[in-house]
A protein has these predicted regions:
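Alpha-helix initiation and N-capping motif
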Residues: 4-8, 20, 63, 67, ...
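Hydrophobic alpha-helix position signal
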Residues: 11, 70, 74, 209-210, ...
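TOPRIM metal-binding catalytic domain and adjacent DNA-binding surface shared by DnaG-type primases
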Residues: 14-112, 118, 243-267
Length: 267
């Protein structure tokens, strides 16, 4: 970002706990005790108090099942602080929205993905770890568009848009809509739909993007995985995926031509 910062300050900005651990490791052999002062991130608005009751993935022990789940999905470690663990998701949500889940009979653990803007949580998503249905539960706390990553995006640059919040963590300056409709009001947006050329609904949606003159990524045939996280798990690197995105982003007449070759269903 063009702004110099020491490792300590970088860690402080990223996650105060990581900064604290770094300083402890750096000075643990010194004779003099080190006094460390830092401020926890301050979250405001509905749900802020309840969010503090959960543990960040970055604070879980390495052998914790949730931490292992995140590592197995190869989520970049610098973003673990954005994710939280709710042992009883329904019960926790009810502390934010009273009686949101009247029955706690089938309560279960979920990964909590908060949506922030200017340190205010305006929505959250609970992702199942197993076969629980629905796989994703997205809850709006304010009447605004569900866009994950607003607190980190630079609107002066090209903004990439995908569906899944976890997928967005693998692409620089990327946000997620947490729904199949990826359209956002931004001239330099590049929409990254899932790689489903045989899914009629996805294909119809992409056709609409092209008609509305959005820049759209149409994954090449040699990419077999459905989404970015699956590509990462299959062995592709973030750099390789970014190269594929750059080389297969289309708009206008060219987008229509490539779409006709990419689509494997009639719409």
């Amino acid at each position: 970002c063009g702004k110099g910062a020491s490792l300590k300050n970088f860690l402080k900005h990223l996650d105060p706990k990581l900064m604290n651990d770094y300083i402890f490791e750096k000075y643990r052999k010194d004779d003099k005790p080190v006094q460390v002062k830092y401020e926890q991130p301050k979250y405001f608005g509905q749900g802020a108090k309840s969010l503090k009751e959960l543990k960040k993935v970055s604070s879980l022990k390495l052998d914790h099942p949730v931490r292992q789940w995140i590592v197995e999905r190869k989520i970049p470690s610098q973003y673990h602080y954005l994710l939280y663990y709710a042992p009883k998701f329904y019960q926790w949500v009810n502390t934010i929205i009273e009686n949101k889940f009247p029955s706690l009979e089938k309560d279960h653990p979920r990964l909590v993905i908060p949506f922030f803007e200017k340190n205010k949580m305006f929505a959250l998503q609970g992702r199942a770890f197993g076969d629980e249905n629905p796989k994703y539960i997205t809850i709006k706390l304010q009447d605004k568009e569900k866009i994950f990553g607003l607190e980190r995006v630079d609107w002066k640059k090209t903004v990439y848009v995908c569906e899944g919040p976890l997928d967005s963590l693998f692409v620089e300056n990327c946000v997620a809509t947490a729904q199949s409709d990826l359209r956002i009001p931004h001239d330099s947006a590049v929409l990254i739909p899932d790689n489903e050329p045989r899914n009629r609904e996805v294909v119809k949606q992409i056709k609409k993007y092209i008609e509305e003159d959005y820049a759209v990524v149409l994954w090449p045939e040699y990419v077999k995985e459905k989404d970015i996280n699956d590509m990462i798990k299959a062995g592709k690197t973030r750099r390789q995926i970014k190269t594929i995105i750059d080389e297969h982003t289309y708009k206008g007449v060219r987008a229509n031509l490539e779409f006709s070759k990419w689509s494997k269903t009639n719409v």
